[in-house]
């Protein structure tokens, strides 16, 4: 009786000559310039399920469920390089990759002596010494921290109708992504 419907889309898209704004040296007088920066690949699944849970003369209740899984990665960067650190682009990773120093906690009072070796003191953020050389520096200790692309996205929308009144309750869930606050750098 057509109470359940839905759709499933599976996709794969390859993009070449990806046009994006790229950071340029300040000596140019500009901070960004448009450039063909490389190639990407996107693939994923989108699922939508619609249900009519209850449908009478004066009252109805419908539910829409969505699930999206997307995997995008840079497959090639212009100039044959495998990383563009200033723009945060890395072959094999998302366009919106976060690259930086890995924060592993807060220096504690009983770690004061160890913290001092890194020029730090208790109460400050503890950074992981990736190459274990006893020094924290941007050249040797930055790593890929994560991506702004979520692992998956889900949505649930319930619509209740009673005579001439509608009530919609919508829930949206993004799982496994990093967020970047411009206010905090």
Predicted regions and their residues:
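Conserved small-residue
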Residues: 52-148, 179, 183
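C-terminal beta-barrel architecture of Gram-negative outer-membrane proteins
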Residues: 167-185
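Short acidic-hydrophobic sequence patches enriched in Asp/Glu that either
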Residues: 29, 39-41, 57, 175
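Extended, folded domain segments that form the structural surfaces/walls around functional sites
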Residues: 1-27, 35, 42
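Flexible, surface-exposed loop regions and adjacent strand-edge segments
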Residues: 16, 22-29, 78-87, 184-185
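Short sequence motifs at beta-strands and strand-loop junctions characteristic
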Residues: 37-43, 95, 146-151
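Flexible, solvent-exposed coil segments and beta strand-coil junctions
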Residues: 22-32, 131-139
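Membrane-embedded beta-strands that build the outer-membrane beta-barrel scaffold
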Residues: 1-12, 45-53, 61-69, 154-160, ...
């Amino acid at each position: 009786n057509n109470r359940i419907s839905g759709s499933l889309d599976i996709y794969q898209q390859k993009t070449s000559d990806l046009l994006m704004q790229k950071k340029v040296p300040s000596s140019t007088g500009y901070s960004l310039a448009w450039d063909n920066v490389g190639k990407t690949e996107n693939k994923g699944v989108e699922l939508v399920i619609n249900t009519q849970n209850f449908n009478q003369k004066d009252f109805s209740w419908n539910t829409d469920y969505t699930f999206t899984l997307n995997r995008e990665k840079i497959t090639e960067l212009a100039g044959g390089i495998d990383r563009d650190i200033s723009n945060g682009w890395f072959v094999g990773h998302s366009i919106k990759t976060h690259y930086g120093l890995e924060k592993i906690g807060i220096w504690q009072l009983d770690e004061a002596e160890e913290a001092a070796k890194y020029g730090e003191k208790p109460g400050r953020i503890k950074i992981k010494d990736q190459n274990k050389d006893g020094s924290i520096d941007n050249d040797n200790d930055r790593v890929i921290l994560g991506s702004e692309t979520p692992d998956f996205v889900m949505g649930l929308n319930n619509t209740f109708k009673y005579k001439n009144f509608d009530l919609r309750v919508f829930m949206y869930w993004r799982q496994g992504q990093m967020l970047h606050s411009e206010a905090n750098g």
